[in-house]
Amino acid sequence: MAIQEKIQNAKTYLGIEFGSTRIKAVLIDDTFAPIASGSHEWQNRYENGVWTYSLDDITTGLQQCYAALTEDIRQKFGVTPTTYGAIGISGMMHGYMAFDKDDNLLVPFRTWRNTITEQAASELSELLSFNIPQRWSIAHLYQAILNGEEHVRHIAHINTLAGYIHYRLTGKRQVGIGEASGIFPVDTTGYNTDYIKKVDEVLSAKGFSVKLTEVLPSVLNAGAKEAFLTADGAKLLDPTGTLQPGVPLCPPEGDAGTGMTATDSVLPRTGNVSAGTSIFAMLVLDKPLKGYYPEIDVVTTPCGAPVAMVHCNNCSSELDAWVKIFGEFAQLSGHPIAKPALYDMLYYHALTGDPDCGNTVVYNFLSGEPVAGAENGRPMYFRTPDGKFNLANLFRAEIYSTMAALKLGMDILFEKEQVSVEKITGHGGLFKTKGVAQQFLADGLGCAVSVMKTAGEGGAWGMALLAAYTVCGGEKSLSEFLDSEVFVGMESTTLQPEKNGAEGFAEFMENYKRGLAAQYAAAK
């Protein structure tokens, strides 16, 4: 069947993911390969002490991203889609969107990037003997209650970004179990009922009488087919009126779940590292962790299997800022360099730097970094007077810095918990320049790192796969579907740690840890 016919006969599957700086849509056909895409750039705002996006930002971004996708389809295939086999929505996990009974947003959306819930996160973690990070939705809700915020008495529902968009498209307040695991702790089928009971008692004692099961979105596993695009939802996504209602929507998932799906990392002893504006590693566990740690989140795969996640708020933003500086210099010189070529030039040059970066250390903290103990962000760098300061070492240190805080958390899993992993797959923008960040990550973690041909597709492709699984999965588990239908014969490259690189990265980390006190002082 020609691709035009597939588009017209609902043999295509659409994934849309709301990342920190880009909203991306990827369309796949029944071979599960991307055939079209569209994107929309956006940025969070820092307003009144809160990192946020407005509802207008969200709606406009969704519509412009979808319009870019349909234009790409028209340009390539000469048709405009009126339907799809299924649609899936993904977004940055966690955060806090609180609504009243009439669906009015009560306070501006508080994104995952905020580190303003320390008291709530600490008290909940102690109550449950389970790490509740500051960015989780339940921490935001409890902190608002502790703060005595006026809006709390009006709360009827809270949601995440992906859950909110799914609700606008379908009228259903539901999320996938992976997304749910960043709202409140889950077990294999839904929210942990023992924990719900304990937290309900605490919230009630603080004057919040609504039960959490009424406030939180319901939970579904991958493959569930319980929501469909409404007429209002179709008009929201496509104001031209071309898109018709009735398309199935799979459970909305977070960027962790789509990353696992996009890297075929949903079975125990597999893992992946997603690296963009933030960076996080996810290792699917074959046994529960013995302890709980502020640096380690326990979330789940889209099927509910437990996952240890090390999440760091900061990854590529500071690196991007330095690339921009050199782009400005090139422009001033009268020899402008295209952005992709500039990235490649600087990344590949970093490979020629000293393994320890010549005693140059970079902190890439634009916002707080709890894994490294940094409450607030202050990008900074330092070097020793006898160090070797040059462009290659500066950029090598910049790239090392994108994964240094991650390394602190991963050491807990590998050394204290003896977690074993058979493969780690990297994906996201940091890996677009072949063999650079991939090699540094292998050196830093001391294990092989693979990057697939689809690494740049990232979460939107993973979300499209989850949408396809809803329709095409049949009786297969998600891992069986991915292994037999999607990743069979997938082209990938694997790099092993190099001795010099690993030793140099270890030296960089010693300097990094020694300098953290200066980072803390600068942020006060």
For the regions a protein language model found, what residue spans apply to each?
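Acidic, glycine/GT-rich loop-and beta-edge segments that sit at the periphery of enzyme/chaperone cores
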Residues: C312, S317-D320, K324-L332, P336, ...
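Glycine-rich phosphate-binding/hydrolytic loop that grips phosphoryl groups
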Residues: G254, T258-A262, V310-V323, R396, ...
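Glycine-rich phosphate-binding loop of actin/hexokinase-like ATP-binding domains
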Residues: Y96-S122, I132, I155, N159-K197, ...
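Activation-segment/catalytic-loop signature of the eukaryotic protein kinase fold
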Residues: T352-K453
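Glycine-rich phosphate-binding loops at beta-strand->alpha-helix junctions
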Residues: R22, V219-L229, E253, T277-I279, ...
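N-terminal glycine/serine-rich phosphate-binding loop of ATP-dependent small-molecule kinases
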Residues: M1-P108, S122-E123, H154, K235, ...
